[in-house]
Every structure is written in C-alpha cells, then in structure tokens.
From Swiss-Prot:
Listed GO CC annotations: cytoplasm
Main EC class the enzyme belongs to: oxidoreductase
GO molecular function ontology, one term from the record: metal ion binding
Entry annotated with the keyword Ligase: no
Keywords assigned: 2Fe-2S, Cytoplasm, Iron, Iron-sulfur, Metal-binding, Oxidoreductase
Gene designation: hcp
Family in the record: Belongs to the HCP family.
Protein EC: 1.7.99.1
UniProt subcellular location: Cytoplasm
Cofactor binding mode and count: Binds 1 [2Fe-2S] cluster. Binds 1 hybrid [4Fe-2O-2S] cluster.
Protein name, entry field: Hydroxylamine reductase
Amino acid sequence: MFCIQCEQTLEAPKKKGCAYATGMCGKTAEISDLQDVLVYILQGVSYWADLAHKFDIIDDEINHWAPRAFFATLTNVNFDRERILALANLAENYKTRLKQAVIAATTLAQQPLPTLPTVAEFTLPNTIDAILTLAPQVAVNRGYETINEDVIGLRLLCLYGLKGAAAYMEHARVLGQTNNAIYAQYHHIMSWLGTDPTDLNALLECSMEIGLMNYKVMEMLDLGETNTFGHPLPSQVNVKPIQGKCILVSGHDLHDLEKILQQTEGKHINVYTNGEMLPAHSYPELKKYPHLVGNYGSAWQNQQLEFANFPGAIVMTSNCLINPNVGKYADRIFTRSIVAWPGVAHIEGDDFSQVIDCALALDGFQHTEIEHMITIGFGRNALMNAAPAVIDQVKQGNINHFFLVGGCDGAKEERSYFTDFAAQVPQDSLILTLACGKYRFNKNNFGDINGIPRLLDVGQCNDAYSAIQLALALANEFDCSINELPLTLVLSWFEQKAIVILLTLFALGVKGIYTGPTAPAFLTDNLLAIIAEKFDMRSISTPEADLNTILSA
C-alpha cells in the first residue's frame, strides 16, 4: 500500500504517506492496491480513447464512464473490493473494445499502430491474488526508487488534480452536461500520465492545463445545476431538528435529493441535508418541497457521531463516506453511484423505496428543537445581482476588503485557524465561503454592511466558479486584475477536488492564496518553493499574523 492523496495522510520524518495495513481514511491496503490497479487500467483506457479520437472514433459510453470510475478512487468514496474489481474488469473490457476499433481503423487506413507504451498493453490478471501481486508495479509512485522525487510529486499533483476534475465531470454528467472536447482532453492527459513522464516543465504545464479544463467543467456543472433546479436564491435554512420521521441526504448529488423529495411526498417524512448538500435549500426547484425541512449536522469528519445520533435513514450520494460501523448505523445508511462500503445497502437506479421503508420503520425525531436559521444561496446569479450594491459600498468606503474563506474541512486541530480567522476579519470586510469548510463558522452571526450580509455562502466546492465570476466582475468594474483587487483567498484543503480548484485558480492567474492547514505531503519542499515563487502561494500561520500581512499590503 502507498497512498498520499489526502491531507490526513501519515507524515513521519523519514516517510510520508499511508503504507501500512490501513490508511488514515479507513481503506485497507488491499483496497488501496486495487484502486492503484484501477487507475492504471483507466490510463490504458484513456490511451486507446485518445488514439481512437485521432481516427474520429468517439465512444460516448466509455467517455461518460471513465471519469466516473476514476472518481471511485477519490478519498472517502469506495471501500468495497467487489465493486472496485467490477470497475477494473469493465475497464479491461472497454480497453479491448477501443483497441479493436483502433486496429480496424488503422488497417482500413493502411497505417501501422504507433509504438505502444506499457500502460496500453497492460492486461488485468484473472485472479485477485495475481492482481494484488502486480499492484506495486503500477502504484501511483512507481519508479520512486530511481526517479527524482520532484517528478513523482508533480505526477501526483497532475493525477490528483485530474481526479478532482473527473469527479466534477461526473457530477455534471448526472445533470445532463457532457462535452466531447472535454472528454478528449481528459483522455489525452490521463493517457500521458500513464506513460510516466519525467519532464518537470511539461508536468507543470500539464497541471495548468488540468486547471483550465476544470474551469470549463465547473461551468458545465453550474449550467447543469441552474438549468435543472433554477438559480440559487438567498434563503434561510433551519439547522435544528423537527419532530417526525426523517431521511438525511449527504454528499453532492442534487439529482438524488430531488428524486428522494419526489418519492417522499405525502409520506410524512422530513428530509434533511448534510454537509455539501446544504446549498440545496437555495435552489427554487428543490426548496419548493415543504418536507425539505432543514440541514442536520456539519462537515464530513463529524459524521460518525452525527449520523449515529440521527434517528432515520441516511443516503450517501458521493464523497465523503467514513466507516459507518463505528457509530453502529451501517444498517440504515445507503450508498449511491460510485460510493460503497462492504455490507452497506447500495441503491441502483432511482428507486429509493428501501430508504423510505427504513425511515418509516425508525423512530425519527421525538421533539422539535428551537429553530436556528442561517443564510445561504449566494450563487453566481445572486452574487451578480448583488454586485452593483457591493460596488457602491466599496466606492463609499464602507467595504474595504473581500475574503474567500472555505474549502474542504477535516479533523486536525489546526483547522480552528479558519474559525478564528473568520471571527477576526475586520467589520468593513465581506467574507465569501463555500464547501464544507464553512461549517467552521457558518452558524455565527457576522452582521451586515448596510444591508449586505458580511457572510455570503456561495455553495458547494465547485461553486468556486461563482466566486470567480464575482471577482471578474469586480475587476472589470474597477479596471484592474483580480490580483489588484482587495481580495484574499484563504483555503482549506483535504482531498482531490480541492487540489483541482487550486490548480484552476493558479491557471487563471490568481496569486497570493493562503492554504492550510498543512501543505500536501506529495509536494516536496522544492516543489512548494517553485509554487510559492510562481504563484505566491502562502502557508497559513496564525490568524493575527496573516491578517496583519494581508491588511498592511
């Protein structure tokens, strides 16, 4: 086992990364190795898809499936051996299908096949023992014994960034947004990474290409969400329980939430969101359901306590899932899509009757607590509508700085930095927030500036796209670059979606970003120095020191 893709990975003085029987996320060495094999086969699929594209062969089924399968290897998604093996076997079949199509095309065109890299000729063994024996040869850090560690680090930066983009591609696909040019670019990058490149400059350029590609993917996802559910509206959400039977929906998939709301109409079941599903309450086509009653709980790392205390059925639509056996709720949590845990019921298709039956059989909340309302819903359209008023307050001198404070949350104590930072932001400043990092402070009262809330909840992690649109609008109004705005980004990272958003910001030329709580372990000191020099990325220190530096610039 070797895994170093998330923020909680082991970091010893002489060795970084999870490399023992179980990773910090809870996945076993076997699952980790199987995921490495799956990634390698997917790189082979992409090699043949990339080659097929040169002959105008486009296989929509494979294009739509490949990023989805890659998403299954993202942190806290799929822990189920049989499901990962099934994905690997299907990848092998798809690779063969593409290969046969390419061979037929080259024969027809009387052209020879190019010299094939190892990744293109890799064949999945027939037995689990043989697959696991082979796993170290295709590990994500393969060649580390002889290859410069900076090369390995940049390969991983690209691989993990592309994995985050693949997750957003799958979210967009679910909402009907596909783009063959994006799929072609994805396959080209994935294929190239499978050839184990060693050129540092080429790898840095690749990371920027991934960032720009992801910007387009986030635009697709924004379009899918707003076309399907309407533009988010500033909305009040109750974060306290209401008496009655209940279902909790976590993850990111608004499509699943809509299906659950439709199927629970008239059944006297209250539906709650959790984690990154909080923004659902601001979409007109979702908030119209009266039994979507509120948000329960906080960020993913608290679920083993919060889910244990939730007296109803739970649906996990995407990341982040952690061991449900710890809180003894494995018998009432259901996984969806590429999410899986051994022994946990998995919902195929759009029939949630199992979930509904489970909720009806459970006690539900016995009492209604005093409501506590928070404000959300400042997506792209709402931000653009508010922009004239914001600009006017800036010109009057009432708003002097903008902070984007958010990102992925996690369990480390150092993450209290983000709570303290938000609390210490000056009263003449606005705070934009997004992703589950917002739970560090989103229940606090930040007041307003002449009617403009000081805390603006932009949405899910992918709604960084909305924040970028506001920054571009402000830069246009004040005839300056984004980096010349009184705008500071303070981002917490945990997994691969955060990595690709960071790459997107870098690729768009955004500099001076503060990140934490720690630097990605897969980046060497040399690479961190290069990134700091090129993009002025800064590690967080203390809220007081960082605010002093920011506001005195």
